Amino acid sequence: MQKVIFLLVLFFFTHNLFAKEEYFLTLGNEKVNLRQGPSFDYPVKIFYKKKFLPVLIQDKSDTFRKIRDHENNSGWIHISQLSKKKAALTIDDDVLVFNKPTIYSTPKVILKKGRLCKIKKCKDEWCNITVDKFKGWVKKDSLWGLL
């Protein structure tokens, strides 16, 4: 019985060590190919034309990363086409950008769904963003591209 308990405990602790960790990166160029497999030999599935578009990294194979975008498209992108710059997309209509990280501060602008925001920093449930010439704070749960 002790062996069974020991093996179960060992399984649960080592399982977490080998779990794949997902994280976000952004597209590093204006033109990026999403391929069906982890090589230049695979055909292009999607041609992205939006620099800093956030993508979720799900797996890796040598110099390629398997990604998923905000529309659930998945495929492989070469690491030279990815950037560590922080950005996110608004996932709700009429996202308010506030002067300070509180709903009681002055709203500065309203963003529509799908708007690309550069992330300066996040603090608790708020993120300081820049969109065009506007800067301010938005609720973290209204953004896609952050963990």
Enumerate the predicted regions with their spans.
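SH3-family beta-barrel domains
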Residues: 18-36, 46-51, 58-100, 104-133, ...
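Sec-dependent N-terminal signal peptides
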Residues: 4-13
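Second-shell loop/turn segments in exported
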Residues: 38-42
